[in-house]
Swiss-Prot record:
I-alpha-I plasma protease inhibitors are assembled from one or two heavy chains (H1, H2 or H3) and one light chain, bikunin. Inter-alpha-inhibitor (I-alpha-I) is composed of H1, H2 and bikunin, inter-alpha-like inhibitor (I-alpha-LI) of H2 and bikunin, and pre-alpha-inhibitor (P-alpha-I) of H3 and bikunin. It comes from Pleuronectes platessa (European plaice). In the N-terminal section; belongs to the calycin superfamily. Lipocalin family. It is found in: Secreted. This is Protein AMBP. The keyword Isomerase does not apply. Residues 236-286, 292-342 form the BPTI/Kunitz inhibitor domain. It comes from the Eukaryota. Pfam families: Kunitz_BPTI (PF00014), Lipocalin (PF00061). Expressed by the liver and secreted in plasma. InterPro entries: A1-microglobln, AMBP, Calycin, Kunitz_BPTI, Kunitz_BPTI_sf, Lipocln_cytosolic_FA-bd_dom, Prtase_inh_Kunz-CS. Its main location: secreted.
Length: 355
């Protein structure tokens, strides 16, 4: 059984000498971490399905890379117990050690003896049950620095849309798509096991293989559009999330308190599902029958399609004139849509104008 150990050293490098309530005191964070990061949901088994790095060594060793397994367990104090299993030169190798938690949720520190390097790692985005993206800033005592991004999955694959968002984040970090290493699914290896390489076959043979069960999505959900997984009961109540990318894209989110679709700035990748291109898409995804009890509140607007609003007093769906919009989510884009949500139209009302 081949086994190596990653040993943490005191935080004497880079001026990281202090502690705060047992946590390492590090420089100001380089990246924002996942909002409301929940460590108890994050621990468990992950697979590194894709990565990129500015480190030349990483790029030189990209051929035929196999997906590895990372198991995280909460240890005593402010530490994470880490067990990593991966294929290395035809042999399954297991490495174990500890990561230091920091005072910033989602930020982790560890030291690599082999490279004499400190690693400052940030969980920039995760939905816990499916994928996680981590950015790592590595600094050696020699002064050499590098940045790596890793895409982890609870299974051996990720949806195409998640991989696309990972690629977008890589570009925002100044690296190109051709630096991304998409790892191969060769199954979970067993420490000490010798792997018989079979280049002519899609996957190598093994004397025995232990495959972990899927923990989250079924196989048919391994790819496809995010809309197929849209959960309005959760998504429409979520706060708007910019995501880890640095773009400035105008989007709309549903404010479940005011029952309005409101503007926010989207970074361009990841974030959550409360993110829509148009007000119409936002309303049609998120509004409920409760909007039928909202008052009619016409207001002037430009460049918007003709809408209908439900008059709760008369029980009618009322058309608005061109150039008039509704100030809340009691707005529909056809009489049929209004009737479907709010009931039978008793009588057509007069065209309304803003007061």
């Amino acid at each position: 059984r081949l086994k190596t150990t990653v040993v943490l050293v005191p935080l004497l490098l880079l001026g990281w000498t202090g502690t705060l309530q047992g946590l390492p005191v590090l420089p100001e964070p380089l990246y924002p971490t996942q909002e409301n990061f929940d460590l108890t949901r994050f621990v468990g088994t992950w697979h590194d399905v894709a990565l990129t790095s500015s480190c030349p060594h990483m790029q030189r060793n990209r051929a035929d890379a196999a997906i590895g397994k990372l198991v995280l367990e909460k240890d005593t104090g402010n530490k994470l117990k880490v067990t990593r299993t991966r294929l290395r030169h035809g042999t399954c190798v297991e490495m174990s050690g500890e990561y230091e938690l920091t005072s910033t949720p989602g930020r982790i520190f560890y030291h690599i003896d082999r490279w004499d390097a400190d690693v400052d790692a940030y969980v920039v985005h995760t939905n816990y049950d499916e994928y996680a993206i981590i950015i790592m800033s590595k600094q050696k005592t020699s002064g050499e620095n590098s940045t790596s991004l890793k895409l982890y999955s609870r299974t051996m694959s990720v949806r195409d849309t998640v991989l696309d968002d990972f690629k977008t984040l890589v570009r925002h970090q100044g690296m190109s798509d051709d630096t991304i290493i998409i790892k191969q699914n060769k199954g979970d290896c067993i420490p000490g096991e010798q792997v018989e390489e079979a280049p002519s076959q899609p996957e190598p043979k093994r004397l025995r293989r232990q495959v972990l069960p899927t923990l989250a999505l079924s196989d048919e959900e391994g790819s496809g559009d995010m809309s197929a997984l849209f959960n309005d009961s959760e998504a429409c109540k979520a706060a708007p999330e910019t995501g880890p990318c640095f773009g400035f894209i105008q989007g709309f989110f549903y404010n479940s308190t005011s029952m309005r679709c409101e503007l926010f700035t989207y970074g361009g990748c990841l974030g959550n599902q409360n993110n829509f291109v148009t007000v119409r898409e936002c309303l049609q995804r998120c509004r409920t029958e409760a909007v039928c009890r909202l008052p009619m509140a016409p207001e002037p607007c430009t460049g918007q399609p003709t809408i209908w609003a439900f008059d709760f007093v008369t029980g009618s769906c009322m058309p608005y004139k061109d150039g008039i919009c509704q100030a809340n989510a009691n707005q529909f884009y056809s009489r049929a849509e209004c009737q479907e949500y709010c009931g039978v139209i008793k009588d057509d009302g007069e065209l309304l104008t803003a007061s």
